[in-house]
């Protein structure tokens, strides 16, 4: 039943791209929110450095007991609070990616299960309103790999951020920006544009 297999695959492809749209929106917003938090961490680093270098005992503030330790404790709490918020954001992004990755897996599994019933010429044919099945499968898998890599790199970056490593904290905002690939983001946006009419048809 080649026709039935193709219709089922197209239905799963639609679900896959709907999941991709949701993932893209969430990752775009989540990355921007995390960028603000990471920038705040970067701003705390110079304060911690300055506190480490200053001798409060030699300033007019010397009359306040344990001031240096209390200021350090307060700044460290601020770092911990920002890291906790970042961990929450990453957990939310992980859930979104998990849902998208599961849908991509379902699509690929369905395609592989019905390979014998799907004519290769049908899978590679495209029209002005509908990309080919092979193109759409490739786009979904590329997006899946990209978001997985983005999550992994983001987690690795966050693991380097502690109040004891001020250099990593100070350079974190620029490193966070580099986690995203403008080229990959453009490819995902282009893929969603190309499937827009396909998604509206049943």
Curated annotation (Swiss-Prot):
GO BP terms, alphabetized: ribosomal large subunit biogenesis
Loss of function: phenotype: Embryos show defects in branchial arch and ceratohyal development.
Superkingdom of this protein's organism: Eukaryota
Sorted UniProt keywords: Cytoplasm, Developmental protein, Nucleus, Ribosome biogenesis
Keyword flag Transmembrane helix: no
Record's keyword annotation contains Acyltransferase: no
Location(s), subcellular: Nucleus; Cytoplasm
Primary localization class, coarse: nucleus
Cellular component GO terms held in the UniProt record: cytoplasm; nucleus
A Pfam cross-reference name: CA109-like
InterPro entries: CA109-like (IPR029159)
Protein role: Part of the 55LCC heterohexameric ATPase complex which is chromatin-associated and promotes replisome proteostasis to maintain replication fork progression and genome stability. Required for replication fork progression, sister chromatid cohesion, and chromosome stability. The ATPase activity is specifically enhanced by replication fork DNA and is coupled to cysteine protease-dependent cleavage of replisome substrates in response to replication fork damage.
Subunit structure: Part of the 55LCC heterohexameric ATPase complex. Does not associate with pre-60S ribosomal particles.
Protein name: AFG2-interacting ribosome maturation factor
Organism: Danio rerio (Zebrafish)
Gene responsible for this protein: airim
